[in-house]
C-alpha cells in the first residue's frame, strides 16, 4: 500500500498536498518547502499543532524509554533540527548516540548549530541522505524514530522497508505523525484552523503562506491510523500499535523488528 499511483502515461504519480505530481518531482518540491522554513521550523510546528507538538514529542520519548547505557544507537529520520534527537540523548542520561538523518541540508545546519549550543555534539551525528536509501549497514540501530516527516517521503513503503532493514533484531520503530481526528466537533474546529488560520499565520511569520498550505494539505492526504498501521505491518514489523494524541490530531505508531 503506497501513496504512489500509475499515471495515464505509465509513469508513477504521487501526492504533493492536493496536487498529483510525477513521483520524481515530489522530493524537490518538499525540499523547497523546508529550505524556506528551516530557521522557523519549531515555530511552524507550534502553529500546525497549536503548541501541542512539544507534549506529543515528550510522550514519544517516554514511549521509547531510551536505555541509559553506552552503545544504545538511535536513527532519527527527517530530524534535521534535532528536536527529537536532543530529547533522546537527554532521556538516556547522555548515554545514547543519535544519528540525525535529513535530506535537507538547511534543516541539518540548524540542528548542528543547536547541538553545539546544547553541548550535545559528542552524542550526535548529522547525515544528509534520503529516507528511501539509508546509507547504513543492515541491523545498525536499536531504534528508528521519525516525527512529522514520513508524510513528506515520496515512497512511504520504501522508507518503512529501509527502517526495517537498518534496525537490529528486537529494535523498535516509532512514527509520530499528524493523523485523522476521531472526534467530529474537534475535526471541524481543526479543519477550520488548518485551512484558514495556519496559512495566514505562516505568511505572517515567514512572509510566505505556500509552505504552510502544502503542509496542511499533506496531512489530509496521509493514510489514517489503521491504513498506516497496515503499511507498517507490510514492511515486516510485528506488535504494531498506535496511540492517538489530542483526539487523533496526531498519532504515535509503534512496531518491532522481531
Swiss-Prot record:
It comes from the Bacteria. S-adenosyl-L-methionine binds at residues 81, 102, 130-131. Pathway: Quinol/quinone metabolism; menaquinone biosynthesis; menaquinol from 1,4-dihydroxy-2-naphthoate: step 2/2; Cofactor biosynthesis; ubiquinone biosynthesis. Its EC number is 2.1.1.163, 2.1.1.201. GO terms for molecular function: 2-methoxy-6-polyprenyl-1,4-benzoquinol methyltransferase activity; demethylmenaquinone methyltransferase activity. It catalyses: a 2-demethylmenaquinol + S-adenosyl-L-methionine = a menaquinol + S-adenosyl-L-homocysteine + H(+); a 2-methoxy-6-(all-trans-polyprenyl)benzene-1,4-diol + S-adenosyl-L-methionine = a 5-methoxy-2-methyl-3-(all-trans-polyprenyl)benzene-1,4-diol + S-adenosyl-L-homocysteine + H(+). It is an enzyme of class 2 (transferase). GO terms for biological process: aerobic respiration; menaquinone biosynthetic process; methylation. Keywords: Menaquinone biosynthesis, Methyltransferase, S-adenosyl-L-methionine, Transferase, Ubiquinone biosynthesis. PANTHER family: 2-METHOXY-6-POLYPRENYL-1,4-BENZOQUINOL METHYLASE, MITOCHONDRIAL, METHYLTRANSFERASE. Methyltransferase required for the conversion of demethylmenaquinol (DMKH2) to menaquinol (MKH2) and the conversion of 2-polyprenyl-6-methoxy-1,4-benzoquinol (DDMQH2) to 2-polyprenyl-3-methyl-6-methoxy-1,4-benzoquinol (DMQH2). Belongs to the class I-like SAM-binding methyltransferase superfamily. MenG/UbiE family. This is Ubiquinone/menaquinone biosynthesis C-methyltransferase UbiE. It comes from Rhizobium etli (strain CIAT 652).
